[in-house]
Amino acid sequence: MKTSLFKSLYFQVLTAIAIGILLGHYYPELGAQMKPLGDAFVKLIKMIIAPVIFCTVVTGIAGMESMKAVGRTGAVALLYFEIVSTIALIIGLIIVNVVQPGAGMNVDPATLDAQAVAVYAAQAKEQGIIAFLMDIIPGSVIGAFASGNILQVLLFAVLFGFALHRLGSKGQLIFNVIESFSQVIFGIINMIMRLAPIGAFGAMAFTIGKYGVGSLVQLGQLIICFYITCILFVVVVLGTIARVTGFSIFKFIRYIREELLIVLGTSSSESALPRMLDKMEKLGCRKSVVGLVIPTGYSFNLDGTSIYLTMAAVFIAQATNSHMDIFHQITLLVVLLLSSKGAAGVTGSGFIVLAATISAVGHLPVAGLALILGIDRFMSEARALTNLVGNGVATVVVAKWVKELDRQKLDDVLNNRAPDGKTHEISS
C-alpha cells in the first residue's frame, strides 16, 4: 500500500508542491532560481499538444459513420460554451458587487505605475474579434504546428479528418499510420508526465520565492473572494450540470485529481490537455467528441477566466472609486461576452483580455490594472483549475447530448469498477 502511494503521480506532485512552497518561503532567492524547472516542463507539454490534437481529431472524425454528427457536436459544444461562460461572468459580477473587496481602498489612479501595464494594454489593442477569427486560419500548416496555435491545428485537423473520411477505403492506410503515430505520441506523454513533480516543484518555488506570501496580504480579500467564487461555481453550477447529466462532480474531480495537481503546480491548464484528451475518452466519451470539445474549450469555455474578468474589472472600479451603475456593468458584461473569446493561445491571456475590456468600456482607469498585476499570478491557479474542470464537464455533457457517451463506462470508471479492456455499447 505504501509503495503504491509513493509511486502515484498524485502523491509525488502534491509532495513536490509542498516542498516548493517551503523552499520559496524560507529561501526565496533559491526558490526564484527554480523557474527553469517549471518552464521546461510546460514547454515539454506544449511541444506535444499540436500532434496530440491532430491525431485525436483526425482519427475521431475519419472513423465516424456520418459527417453530420461532427457538425452537430460542434454546434452543441459552442452553444454550451456560450451559456456556461455567460453564467460564469454573471456570477463573478454578482459576487464582487456583494462582497465589494475593493471598497475603502481609495486608490488614486494617478499614483499608479501605468508603465507596468503598458505592454499588456498595447497587446490588448491588437486583440479584436475580427483579428481573433482571422488568426484561426494559419498562414501555413507547418506554421500552425510550429507556433502551437491550438485553434489553427484544430482547423487543419478537422479538414484533414473530413478529407480522409471521404476517401473511404483508399484512406485506410493513412488512417492506420496516424493511429499508430498517436500511440507513439501518448507514449511520449507518459514519459513527460514522470517529470511532472519536478515541474510542479520548480513553478511553485519560483512563485512563492519571487512574490512571497506576504504580498498576498494587501489584496488578499480579492484573492480569497475569487477562490471562493471559483469553488462555488464548480460545486454549485458545474455540480448541478453534472448531476443533471447523470454523474457526480466530486467523483469526476477525484478522477482527474492528478491533472488538477499538475495544473495547480504549473498554473497552466494547457499542461494537462494531452492527458485530458486520453482520460475523457477512457471515461466513455467518443474520441471525435473529445477531440473537438477539449481543444475548442480552451478558447471558448474558460469559466475560471470569465469569473476573473468581471471580478477584476469591478474591483478596479471599487478600489479607484470609479462609480459603475447598472448600465455600465451591463455594458461590461456585453463587452466581456465578446472579448473573452479572443484569449486563445496568448501568454497572459486573461490579463490581456482584461486590459482590452477596460479600454473598450472606457469608464475605468487603465492604470488601475497595476493593482491586479501584482496578484494576477496568485489568481492564475484558480482560473486554470476551474477552466480544466469546466472543460471536462463540458465534454461529458456534449457527448451525452449528441448520444456519443458510453453511460455504463462512465459509471464504472467514476465508481472504480471498470474492468480492464471491457467495452460497452454507446447509449442512445
Curated annotation (Swiss-Prot):
The chain crosses the membrane at residues 4-24, 44-64, 76-96, 142-162, 184-204, 222-242, 289-309, 326-346, 352-372. It comes from the Bacteria. Keywords: Cell inner membrane, Cell membrane, Membrane, Symport, Transmembrane, Transmembrane helix, Transport. It is found in: Cell inner membrane. The keyword Transmembrane helix applies. GO terms for biological process: L-aspartate transmembrane transport. GO terms for cellular component: plasma membrane. Its main location: membrane. GO terms for molecular function: fumarate transmembrane transporter activity; malate:proton symporter activity; succinate transmembrane transporter activity. It is a multi-pass membrane protein. Belongs to the dicarboxylate/amino acid:cation symporter (DAACS) (TC 2.A.23) family. Responsible for the transport of dicarboxylates such as succinate, fumarate, and malate from the periplasm across the membrane. This is C4-dicarboxylate transport protein.
